[in-house]
């Protein structure tokens, strides 16, 4: 069970996008690394040649950032927080350490 999963609100804690809040679009676990693709954060521009199906041009795309550079963002309290695990009715669930609110 991962601490940050798709659909979570996260805040970027390091890098040029520090302080930006976004929603995790996709998690990629490959080669022992975990990368998070966050909506509207870490944008880069890509030049695409025209083809039969698509026009060419310069597009902004989201790139993956390392999961160590993001933290869970509690949208109710408006602060970043850590995520922990506990057992509720024999089921392992994620909870916010700052408020104790159960996520799953």
Curated annotation (Swiss-Prot):
GO molecular function: rRNA binding; structural constituent of ribosome
Keywords for this protein: Ribonucleoprotein, Ribosomal protein, RNA-binding, rRNA-binding
Cited SUPFAM superfamilies: Translation proteins SH3-like domain (SSF50104)
The keyword rRNA-binding is assigned to this record: yes
Any matching Pfam family: KOW
Highest taxon listed in the record's lineage: Bacteria
Transmembrane spans: none
GO biological process, one term: translation
GO (cellular component) term, any one: ribonucleoprotein complex
Quaternary state and interactors: Part of the 50S ribosomal subunit.
Function recorded in the entry: One of two assembly initiator proteins, it binds directly to the 5'-end of the 23S rRNA, where it nucleates assembly of the 50S subunit. One of the proteins that surrounds the polypeptide exit tunnel on the outside of the subunit.
Stated family: Belongs to the universal ribosomal protein uL24 family.
HAMAP family, per the entry: Ribosomal_uL24_B
The protein, known as: Large ribosomal subunit protein uL24
Organism: Anaplasma phagocytophilum (strain HZ)
Upper taxonomic lineage: Bacteria, Pseudomonadati, Pseudomonadota, Alphaproteobacteria, Rickettsiales
Gene designation: rplX
């Amino acid at each position: 069970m991962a601490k940050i999963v798709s659909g979570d609100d996260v805040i970027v804690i390091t890098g040029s996008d520090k302080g930006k809040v976004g929603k995790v679009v996709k998690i990629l676990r490959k080669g022992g690394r975990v990368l998070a693709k966050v909506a509207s954060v870490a944008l880069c521009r890509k030049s695409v040649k025209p083809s039969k199906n698509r026009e060419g041009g310069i597009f902004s795309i989201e790139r993956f950032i390392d999961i160590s550079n993001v933290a869970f963002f509690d949208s109710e309290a408006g602060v970043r927080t850590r995520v922990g695990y506990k057992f509720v009715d024999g089921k392992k669930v994620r909870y916010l350490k700052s408020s104790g609110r159960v996520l799953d």
